[in-house]
Amino acid sequence: MNSPLAPVGVFDSGVGGLTVARAIIDQLPDEDIVYVGDTGNGPYGPLTIPEIRAHALAIGDDLVGRGVKALVIACNSASSACLRDARERYQVPVVEVILPAVRRAVAATRNGRIGVIGTRATITSHAYQDAFAAARDTEITAVACPRFVDFVERGVTSGRQVLGLAQGYLEPLQRAEVDTLVLGCTHYPLLSGLIQLAMGENVTLVSSAEETAKEVVRVLTEIDLLRPHDAPPATRIFEATGDPEAFTKLAARFLGPVLGGVQPVHPSRIH
């Protein structure tokens, strides 16, 4: 039986999942969090589904083995590649980023035309398209925006170059007259201002990060594992499988003073 004092485990292929960690911290400030950014193997978008599944489950094994009370797959590519395997494999709740965002988009749309942007792996997996299939009277337009992740990982989230890239990627969504757009990659909220500018103010952006954090709140409440308010102050541990210094520089933009330090993950621990 898991303890309410156990941490919530969160992982992503890099820094993008920190948008989810930030949202969880904002909504559940008392919770301990252990975050692993798989920068040594990411970004996952260009990888094959079997490669993504192998990397994601290795990190999931590590976090569950360390006693987390819930596992958050804070990566759309990993959610689409290994969610079923993870839920069969682990005896803790597994929260992913796709279905929470889909529910919010269906509730938000006014004309039934919904856009989804994500990595090539996420879009070609049809995970979002399949998740929307149960929603009546919706028309889905999905577009891969692979270079967005590269810009975010380099810390470039504004400027003419990335705006021009966004306008090119998003043009099919404008032609489809979508009124709701799912940011189907946890890196993309860092580009939300630029994406909103390109799409226009009448388009509602749905952040998978915010909706996933709400799902974590719901799940922990349902199984009575919320950390008590009178527990010791929350601790947050951030780890990277790649260069911790490079991770820290980028992560500070997501978390600010909440970040603290970033610890390296020895390759022998995740295999």
UniProtKB/Swiss-Prot annotation:
GO molecular function, one term: DNA topoisomerase type II (double strand cut, ATP-hydrolyzing) inhibitor activity
GO CC, any one term: plasma membrane
Residues the record lists as binding substrate: D12, S13, Y44, G45, N76, S77, T186, H187
Catalytic center residues: C75 (proton donor/acceptor), C185 (proton donor/acceptor)
UniProt cross-references to SUPFAM superfamilies, sorted A to Z: Aspartate/glutamate racemase
Reaction(s) catalysed by this chain's protein: L-glutamate = D-glutamate
Family in the record: Belongs to the aspartate/glutamate racemases family.
PANTHER family membership: GLUTAMATE RACEMASE
Name of this protein: Glutamate racemase
Origin species: Mycobacterium tuberculosis (strain ATCC 25618 / H37Rv)
